[in-house]
A protein has these predicted regions:
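C-terminal capping alpha-helices of c-type cytochrome domains
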Residues: 83-97, 110-136, 225-241, 249-279
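Electrostatic cytochrome c docking/interface patches
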Residues: 14-30, 147-175
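Gly/Gly-Pro-rich "capping" loops immediately C-terminal to redox-active cysteine motifs
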Residues: 42-84, 103-115, 141-149, 186-226, ...
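Extracellular/periplasm-exposed beta-strand and loop segments of Gram-negative cell-envelope proteins
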Residues: 135-141, 157-159
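Soluble non-cytosolic domains of exported or imported proteins
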Residues: 19, 29, 81-82, 113-117, ...
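Bacterial N-terminal signal peptides
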Residues: 2-13
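Extended amphipathic alpha-helical interaction segments
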Residues: 156-157, 181, 188-191
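The canonical Cys-X-X-Cys-His
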Residues: 25, 32-42, 87, 122, ...
Length: 294
């Protein structure tokens, strides 16, 4: 009787997730990590939900033109023929099954930090979505050669404890939601000031410039209340009531759980105050563009 009892006690001691792996993957891919934001084609009235994750969107940047791939289970035009490990390698290491490197705008340098549990959940979700047959003939183009890799092979990655709000918030703002990717300007690949904003984005809406999300009280969000920060993230409405601009995916962020939002805000509160960096001469960026913050 001793062994079965020990086994039962061990099972009871294990953390239990209230949602299934696929449900957790759906939350990540559709809400906080917003894979759907890039990988779902758009029409004049918004995302084409019958082609969710079917790819084909073109992302234009001053250094590249990226054609977004189909990541549905379609075996011919998607990733249906890939193994789970191959999909995980594509997400965390930016490496396709044929060995070629996935370039920007895929944020592989952030996804390297995704926990084993979270990346498995995303794979389970991608296996479960309807297959979309969407042949994509256009190719991505990069003005600069891609590196040989985005880093060494990723080993085991543990998730930070959820009861450490700042550490877990840093995980959400980094590898999961990639807040710091947009809200940190980089010059020659170096992060000038984490969270200080100033990065320009060009789209159908015009030009938007990422906001300073550090604890600086004049240039950042240091004097905002938690409710004001949450409203900005969930609804795209700034403290003064003006509407924020894309590419921040406010519609998806409405579904962020209360616990995750608390952790995100705790992390943002912990960022040292920084002033938004000035653009490089000739960069063409417009950090001071009125009404174009996000």
């Amino acid at each position: 009787m001793g062994r079965p009892l020990v086994g039962i006690l061990l099972l009871l001691a294990m953390p239990v997730r209230s949602e299934t792996l696929v449900e957790h993957g759906r939350y990540l891919a559709e809400t906080i990590a917003v894979c759907t934001n890039c990988h779902t084609p758009r029409g004049p009235n918004g995302p084409l939900l019958d082609k969710k994750l079917g790819g084909g969107e073109v992302i234009k940047h001053q250094d590249f033109t990226a054609v977004v791939p189909n990541i549905t289970p379609d075996r011919e035009t998607g990733i249906g023929a890939w193994t789970d490990n191959e999909i995980m390698s594509a997400i965390r290491e930016g490496r396709r099954p044929d060995g070629s490197l996935i370039g920007p705008a895929m944020p592989s340098r952030f996804y390297r930090g995704l926990s084993d549990e979270d990346v498995r959940a995303i794979v389970a979700y991608l296996r479960a979505v309807p297959a979309v047959h969407n042949p994509i003939t256009a190719k991505s183009h990069y003005d600069r050669p891609l590196p040989a890799s985005w880093g060494p092979p990723v080993g085991q990655v543990a998730e930070p404890p959820k009861d450490d709000k700042i550490a877990y918030g840093a995980y959400l703002a980094g590898p999961v939601a990639r807040c710091m990717d947009c809200h940190t300007e980089q010059h020659n690949g170096l992060e000038a000031a984490l969270g200080a904003g100033g990065k320009a984005f060009y789209g159908p809406w015009g030009v938007s410039v990422s906001a300073n999300v550090t604890s600086d009280e004049s240039d950042g969000i240091g004097d905002w209340s938690d409710a004001e920060i949450e409203r900005a993230i969930r609804t795209g409405v700034a403290r003064d009531g003006h509407k924020l601009f894309p590419p921040m995916p406010f519609t998806a962020y409405t579904g962020i759980t209360a616990d995750d939002m608390t952790a995100l805000i705790a992390y943002l509160r912990s960022l040292p105050p920084r002033v938004e960096p000035a653009p490089l001469s000739g960069s063409g960026q417009a950090p001071g563009a009125a009404g174009s913050r996000h």
